[in-house]
A protein has these predicted regions:
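Beta-strand-loop-alpha-helix segment that lines the small-molecule cofactor/substrate pocket
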Residues: 1-33
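Basic phosphate/pyrophosphate-binding loop/patch that engages nucleotide-derived ligands
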Residues: 17-25, 39-53, 118, 142-146
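Residues embedded in well-ordered beta-strands within globular domains across many folds
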Residues: 54-57, 96, 139, 159
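Rossmann-like dinucleotide-binding domain that binds NAD(P)(H)
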Residues: 63-133, 137-141, 152-153, 219
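A general structural signal for well-ordered alpha-helical segments in protein cores
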Residues: 12, 35-38, 80-84, 197-202, ...
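Short arginine-rich
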Residues: 227-237
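Short glycine/serine/threonine-enriched helix-capping/active-site loop
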Residues: 27-30, 56-59, 97, 125, ...
């Protein structure tokens, strides 16, 4: 099923709770789960290269195409929400969002979304279809290094920057310590030349053969819809945080 799974969390939950017959496979097309660049970033996070991950910053912008049936939250943000859940391997505790309405009869043209995870990790998502530049970026900030995923940069999809913030003794009267930047080299790791769509299709075929649910299954699709709905609700409340209580 093409993402998002449904146009509301309730409809997605109904699908997620639908009793599948033995052997039935239900997959939602969250393609970035199968992007070799995103999966390399995830490996860097969990092998300790970045240290402790503090936050993610995601940008998905372009000048169009504009939709009138749904807001930019439901149109563009599913990708970045999916990436965030994949990288952090869990659900946020709360969501807040603000949205701008600039075109005539617009359901929402630009949005700034913040996901707060139980461990304090943050994800900031900027989505827009009224931006002059097409950008598809994810920055992962860790205590030891940071990594950028840039889907528009074919030869440099992932770049690791060995830069850390260090606490050093301070002799200033303005604080007991100060932060300094320790800069190191930048590394461009090898990314296997795999096509995400092909990888997604192969995952589906594998699930059919093994009769096991795929990585982006119906429950995953529901959780993403729950986050999108919470973001839209927060935007209507001028950015008030909305708690997430996914039921599956």
């Amino acid at each position: 099923i093409e993402k998002p799974l449904a146009n509301s969390a309730a409809a997605a939950l109904e699908l997620a709770q639908y009793p599948l017959a033995d052997g039935q496979i239900f997959m939602v097309g969250h393609i970035f789960r199968f992007h070799p660049g995103i999966n390399r970033v995830r490996e860097l996070m969990y092998e300790g290269t970045l240290g402790t991950t503090r936050y993610l910053h995601c940008v998905r912008t372009n000048l169009g195409p504009v939709r009138k049936d749904v807001s930019v939250i439901w149109d563009l943000a599913p990708h970045d929400v999916s990436i965030a859940l994949h990288l952090f391997n869990g659900m946020p505790a709360r969501v807040s969002a603000t949205m701008g309405y600039y075109l005539q009869n617009s359901p929402g043209d630009v949005a700034f979304i913040t996901l707060t995870f139980p461990g304090g990790e943050l994800v900031n998502i900027h989505v827009s279809w009224v931006d002059p530049q097409k950008r598809r970026e994810v920055d992962v900030i860790g205590t030891n290094a940071l990594v950028r995923f840039d889907d528009m940069n074919v030869g440099e999809t992932v770049r690791i920057v060995q830069r850390a913030l260090l606490e050093v003794p301070s002799y200033s009267t303005f604080g007991e310590f100060q932060l300094v930047t320790h800069a190191g080299e930048s590394v461009i790791p090898f990314i296997p030349p795999k096509e995400p769509l092909k990888e997604q299709c192969q995952e589906f075929l594998k699930s059919i053969q093994t009769r096991q649910q795929p990585l982006s299954d119906v429950r995953d699709g529901y959780r993403i819809c729950a986050i999108l709905e919470a973001a839209a609700a927060s935007a209507k409340q001028h950015g008030a945080p909305v708690n997430i209580e996914a039921e599956v």
